[in-house]
Amino acid sequence: SVTDRDGVRYILKTWWEGRECNIRDREECMEAMRLLAGLHKDLEFIPTFPEMEGIPTPVIRRFLPSREYEKHNKELKRARRFLKQRSQKTWFEIRLAAVMDPFLEEAGQICEEWKKIENSHDVEAGETFCFCHGDYQYHNILRQDRGFFLVNFEKCQADGPIRDLYLLLRKLLEKSDWDCNRGEALLAAYESVRPLNPFERQDLFYRLSYPEKLWKIVNFYYNSGKAWIPEKNQEKLDRLLEQETARKKFLRILRP
């Protein structure tokens, strides 16, 4: 980094020329999955630390989604309460209020099931971690004539590989209206390089099952000014509801 005479610090990067992964191109998306699997395979490790007298042995812990989901559920309930008390509602608010109950029921059930699985999983017994990219999305996957490469590792951290896999897979499935054939092909591309173990498959299933897209829509609405609601919010909600049947179908296929 460099600092100018006013004390403002800048980070200088060497930037590579390339274009973003084309999310409409099936083969490019599958290659992005294989690239991710290769990254995880190369960066896998089992945490071991030498014992030192008087110094506690550090422990690397996996991110537990259920804790974040519990927080999201509280935020959804708060927004639902606000909507019920609001006397004059816009069309968006009427639509949102009508679907909150079933989505919240689903979110609560998923959270409880996932907590039981997390609690029964022995995370101390030589668990394998990897260094995750942390923001593995198509705009960080660039292509040159020589092939794909990754940029923006600022969020890189030690965690389970599903952190990256879930993010990219969910984005690609949303863009393809949760096409089951495409979803299975993308997952198969990843597993052709690095197969998932049973716990990782459960992890992926529950992350995809949680209605995170609805939470994002609700969270943006609740924390912004409600006098004027962008038309984009309505479009996102409509698209979410249109895709729900296809999403459920894919989850039935994925369920361990």
Across the structure, where does each feature detected by a protein language model lie?
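ATP-dependent phospho-/nucleotidyl transfer catalytic cores
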Residues: 19-24, 50-131
